[in-house]
């Protein structure tokens, strides 16, 4: 009976692996390109800009398509060319001058050949989720520290807060230290879990998308925070409130650390985050009142 159960588990694992094998085989056909030292930085830039582009188009259309304003956090705001170009320029410059040498060192230490077998689907999904949770924890601690220590904020993090209203290309408008910190945590987590290269690829795509969505300024019915239940995920309004208030919502994605440490504030666009937490609702209302007072003062 025990042998029969073991056999069933092995068959299940093989079937999970077979689901991803065709995809992995197609990637391996371009192994020379995937193993290139230029691949990580090119992949990162094109993935990032590819995710930003739809939101840039929406920002251009927004003044002439009134229905789009219904989904904007700040309906009357659209980034100007003078705001977009510096963000694009800084992203390209930092990736080429700073991120590329770091990825080159990582490439030199990576295996010479890609594995023949794809990961199991369950393993890929679990590793991506764990990497996201680890990244969320690390950035929460990093972010909180850089807001609590004035010198760290002024020296390293203030650049990212120059744009108080979020837009997609402002996602990576940050200091070199901040960008390298994010890159370090990215690499550290997949190394600790010894992730399969396909898992690493998927994690980077998901991580880039979530960060762009958080800064996009658009809250759609299909936004991630509306798909994740129980208010576990913050979302675009959650992060936009951080850019407005500075002293709340330090975690990039999930809400558990802000809830535990009392720094969660609930944006008017996402009251669902406050479900089941009266204290969170109170603090969210206080935060909203503070925001209105701040606008009146200015």
From Swiss-Prot:
Task: Cite the EC number.
Answer: 1.14.99.38
Q: What inducers act on this gene?
A: Down-regulated by testosterone.
Q: Which Gene Ontology terms describe the biological processes this protein takes part in?
A: B cell chemotaxis; cholesterol metabolic process; negative regulation of cholesterol metabolic process; negative regulation of fusion of virus membrane with host plasma membrane; response to type I interferon; sterol biosynthetic process
Q: Where is this motif: Histidine box-1?
A: 142-146
> What are the record's GO terms for cellular component?
endoplasmic reticulum membrane
Instruction: List the InterPro entries hit by this protein, alphabetically.
Output: Fatty_acid_hydroxylase, Sterol_Desaturase_Related
Q: Where is it located? A: Endoplasmic reticulum membrane
Sequence motif Histidine box-2, location on chain: 157-161
Q: What is this enzyme's catalytic activity, as reactions? A: cholesterol + AH2 + O2 = 25-hydroxycholesterol + A + H2O; cholesterol + NADPH + O2 + H(+) = 25-hydroxycholesterol + NADP(+) + H2O
What does the function comment of this entry state?
Catalyzes the formation of 25-hydroxycholesterol from cholesterol, leading to repress cholesterol biosynthetic enzymes. Plays a key role in cell positioning and movement in lymphoid tissues: 25-hydroxycholesterol is an intermediate in biosynthesis of 7-alpha,25-dihydroxycholesterol (7-alpha,25-OHC), an oxysterol that acts as a ligand for the G protein-coupled receptor GPR183/EBI2, a chemotactic receptor for a number of lymphoid cells.
Task: Specify the protein name.
Answer: Cholesterol 25-hydroxylase
Organism encoding this protein: Rattus norvegicus (Rat)
- Give the taxonomic lineage as stored in the record: Eukaryota, Metazoa, Chordata, Craniata, Vertebrata
